[in-house]
Amino acid sequence: MFKIFTLLALSQSPDPLYLESLYSRQDPLSLTKQLYFYAQYPDTHEGQRAKKKILELLDISSLDPLMPVELNSILFEELLKAVFKTTTKPILLDSPSINFINNLSLNHKNRTLKGSSHLTRGDLENGDTCDIDVGRGMLVLAFGEEPDGKEKILSYEAVLDFMALCVKARLSKEASNEEKVHAMNHFIFYELGYRFPAHSEHEEKIDTYTLLPSVLDNRQGVCLGVSLLYYALAQRLGLNLDIYTPPGHIFLSLHEDLNIETTARGIHMPIEAYLSLHVKSLNKRTQKELLGMALFNQSSVFLKKQDFKKAADLYEKALAFIPDDPQILELLGSCYLMDKQLAKTHRVFTKLQKIKEKNLLTSNYIVEDFFKGYITPEGLQAIFKDVDSDMQSLINKSYELEAIHKKSPKFRSALYQLGITYLQLHQYEKAFLALEKLYTQADDDPALVYYLTQLSLIRFDRPKTLLYKEKLKFLIKKHDYNPQAVQRLLEEIEHLWPSGFDTNL
């Protein structure tokens, strides 16, 4: 990756031949590298060449001649330091820098959105679903209630505008949408080097790697954090991207042949790669819902810490952006239950009962178990209990779930989690017995029947394998969905025991 202060560290009076050689190696379409060169050598011949190139890349001639746009080497150094950050210190640009970038960015397409002027959370909540400026919205969520919030919003927004200018510098005026996507991928993931954080870090600090200011400060982000940055820049380029959210994930899409996987440097992955045994189809989100997903991610941190009041508060705020979302309602009701606020739990779960989740095949046991009186706050806490990566943590969870099941044998969610935990521990016999017991209470769950078919095959139990195989085939036909995992399992069974195979021969 381009090193931030390579040029700044060079001698102030280098040999002209060396300068000529150095400049010839700069990417002519990289606005940042041209700016670095000019910022360090403004009075040299090559520095003036860089200045001329900067004016060309910024398309200064297309701007209003009355707008004050003056190239300033010191100002450029500050802007570049803000984009190529080497510390997590918050970005705070002065007014001249902000005004300078704003004057250069008046043609950014996000300026036509009503949401580009929002300054409070109320503005966002009441704003039009598809007229939200995602960059401004995320900055309002982060800073809107702080005394100096407006200054911070404008400062970070200037950095977003500057980043969009850097992407535009690589594009012709007739650039296609596909070319814009490729230019954004190059700038974000290669020139700036944005990366997915280490697994151990992102699990503990998912809020840090989700909120847009933190993503800009760290140049790292989880799928949602980098997708928010990507979408904010796309709006400035006039790109209308679709937003999809498989459970626990998010990706963007220009069209079905060009999806954007922000955890893998923007590569395309087919829609089928995001579907699974549990997920029949994908939720398509609005710009407003995208902001709500950030609050949703924040709440998971407090849920993990068992701060159920704070988690519930954030889930409530997320619902203002994503009304009637089944996953948020389930987690909100669960937080209320674990906090022993039964009246609020009843209100939320009553609402959830009326909502049909079309995209998921997995049955929701928690709501039904609550109304049947099978569930307890302590039992639910065991289900949501976080586990470490070590084996002992899983073993301890299995012991806790065993105790919960013994105390509440009809609590299906606990029994399901116990079976899955046994699977993770490779205790296949125990997993089979636990899930088969659950099957007597819930025989219409495709995921459950898939696991029982797989475990029967692992145990080489032909009668049970064929029994559950037929049930699985019935359920996937009923739901009109045949995921790849099921296809592979059925092929494996057919290969081992072909149809019409007589074991007595």
Region spans (language model):
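Sec-dependent signal peptide recognition
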Residues: 1-7
